[in-house]
């Protein structure tokens, strides 16, 4: 009955859902619209230096092509969905135009594109690559093969923790969001965000892949994979980070970084020629 309702009647089934609808909707910030993060604005860090912006794309020849614009703070691990788009049976030109639009609006550091079969042509598109290269934006492929094909079931499901947990309301005994989400969604007034929320709350590993509506969920998953890499790398201990047990707090404070180019320029200026 659950599978029938989700696939053939396209109904949201809340019982034992992978993504709890209470948590997903509780992660939506009514005070944040879609668009780029603004330093110091609501729910945005004051210093944007540690924020990394990316866009995941799940392209398709037939059906929908999903775009998810995503940001992660490499220091705090906080995530934001900035916007989501989907195109129905798009032409290569329409996909190219949407990539250019996202690049101009959000200035992402990179695009992550599923690159199996037809999708590989998108990664190799010369016009797209020239446009992105002129703006310093990377285009990275995501390959689905025999070693990671279970990402669709286990990997996607692992994102459920990003939306936080529920607690029981003391008044009406109903589950409410605990406010502990790591991922923030903007208010769902746009078609892309609405569809992303619908795909999340109805997503189930029990439904065969060919019947799932998951274009935006997969584009979100590509971004989250990259976000985990960035957060893990930022927390890795570095030699210059003051992790030595033999350094006192005063010694750590007295250390600083120098620019070797500035030192070389200063030495060049002080050099006396005879």
Residue ranges, per PLM feature:
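ATPase catalytic-site recognition across NTP-hydrolyzing enzymes
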Residues: 1-57
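P-loop NTPase motor core of the ASCE superfamily
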Residues: 3-7, 198-240
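Short, flexible loop/turn elements at secondary-structure junctions
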Residues: 12, 59-61, 117
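Acidic two-metal-ion nuclease catalytic site recognized across multiple nuclease folds
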Residues: 17-27, 223-274
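Mg2+-dependent endonuclease catalytic cores in nucleic-acid-processing enzymes, primarily RNase H-like
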Residues: 69-203, 264-274
